[in-house]
Amino acid sequence: MKFTGPLVPATLVQRYKRFLFDAILTDGTAITGSCPNTGSMRGLTTPGSRIWLSEHDSTTRKYRHMLEIVEADGTLVGINTGLPNRIAEEAISAGQVSNLDSYDTLRREQRYGRNSRIDILLSDAEKGLAYVEVKNVHFSRLSGLAEFPDSPTERGAKHLEELGDMVAAGHRAIMLYLVQRDDCSRFRICRELDPVYARAFERASTRGVEAYAVKCQVSPLQIVATGPMMVDEAVPAVL
């Protein structure tokens, strides 16, 4: 997924109220921008961090700049939760997700379950339906290990339950964890930060929900999926 224009480098001053951040551009200009990530962004909001911003001239936007990338421990990390579905679609089409590249049709944001929308719905005359829920992953505490979630997510647990219902109805259901950083080779569910989600993940797995993780290469020009990652069991990490 290529950005529509070159990203603007800056230095993070603070991120606050979930939706906002202050930064200093390279010419010394102080700006306030929007943050397209309402999660905790644990480990990615350190003042002084190098960041990259997209620019938007639309008169419908209150802020011209939007946060896209944060540098953490020398690694570029994509934080925009509005991008993973597009990146996942490219990854599936490129055959980077096990057994999902040969479906006839791919549709996004389709209604299903209990008044929910599935991120990607694959359909095929012979294979039937495959429901794909995409989660953005940017959290890493241990070298080489990406984790999700970085804070409690009731909505995420609900999605796992609904995916299990799709399996019970005779369809495939897949959790696709899109890791927007390239310094990790393994992925796990973070039981310590959300034990409820971890239990929901285990229940979904026993019901037949599949789980895959895909690594991304992040740059100020584009974010592209580069291939699958190992998914570890949801056991406590040793810090």
From Swiss-Prot:
InterPro entries the UniProt entry points to: SfsA, SfsA_C, SfsA_N
Alphabetical list of Pfam families matching this protein: SfsA, SfsA_N
Gene Ontology molecular function: any one: DNA binding
Organism superkingdom: Bacteria
UniProt family annotation: Belongs to the SfsA family.
PANTHER family: SUGAR FERMENTATION STIMULATION PROTEIN A (PTHR30545:SF2)
Annotated HAMAP family: SfsA
Protein name, as recorded: Sugar fermentation stimulation protein homolog
High-level lineage: Bacteria, Pseudomonadati, Pseudomonadota, Alphaproteobacteria, Hyphomicrobiales
